[in-house]
């Protein structure tokens, strides 16, 4: 069958491509030639509360291999995000809890409570009607057959 083209065209693994030979070699410590203010700014932008102290430690110990290993494991800190409500809790976010008031103390609050109860009852009734609106009944089925 022959040799696949991808195998023939790839260079041997021990030979680096020509564009890679001209590149600067990677350093284990990325902060080796950085200034203190640059390191502080980097930590501040990542949201670190102790940015100045961490930058000072890294700048002083730039040649230490333990610091280089710690920097590899360092991940960018993000402020905690507010999680969106789940589907099951989303409808509960619109519910209101009515504070209990004594009807004798404030006659206006009693009328407000009554009007709120009427409002909630009408909402429930309209939701029930909407739910039942599209349910097929025996008359709608016969109507479809005749036409």
Curated annotation (Swiss-Prot):
The keyword Heme does not apply. Residues 108-119 have a biased composition (Polar residues). Keywords: Cell cycle. Residues 1-27, 99-147 are annotated as: Disordered. InterPro entries: AVPI1, Avpi1/C8orf4_dom. Transmembrane segments: none annotated. GO terms for biological process: positive regulation of MAPK cascade. The keyword Cell cycle applies. Residues 121-134 have a biased composition (Basic residues). Pfam families: TC1 (PF15063). May be involved in MAP kinase activation, epithelial sodium channel (ENaC) down-regulation and cell cycling. This is Arginine vasopressin-induced protein 1. It comes from Pongo abelii. The lineage of its organism: Eukaryota, Metazoa, Chordata, Craniata, Vertebrata.
């Amino acid at each position: 069958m022959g040799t696949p083209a991808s195998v023939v065209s790839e260079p041997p693994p021990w030979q680096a491509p020509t564009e890679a030979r001209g590149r600067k070699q990677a350093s284990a410590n990325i902060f080796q030639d950085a200034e203190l203010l640059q390191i502080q700014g980097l930590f501040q932008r990542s949201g670190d509360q102790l940015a100045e102290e961490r930058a000072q430690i890294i700048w002083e110990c730039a040649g230490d291999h333990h610091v280089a290993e710690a920097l590899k494991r360092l991940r960018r800190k993000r402020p905690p995000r507010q999680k969106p409500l789940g589907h099951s809790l989303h409808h509960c976010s619109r519910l209101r809890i009515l504070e209990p008031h004594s009807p004798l103390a404030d006659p206006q609050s009693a009328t407000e409570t009554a009007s709120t109860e009427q409002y909630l009852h009408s909402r429930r009734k309209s939701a029930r009607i909407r739910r039942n609106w599209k349910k097929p009944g025996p008359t709608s089925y016969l109507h479809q057959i005749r036409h």
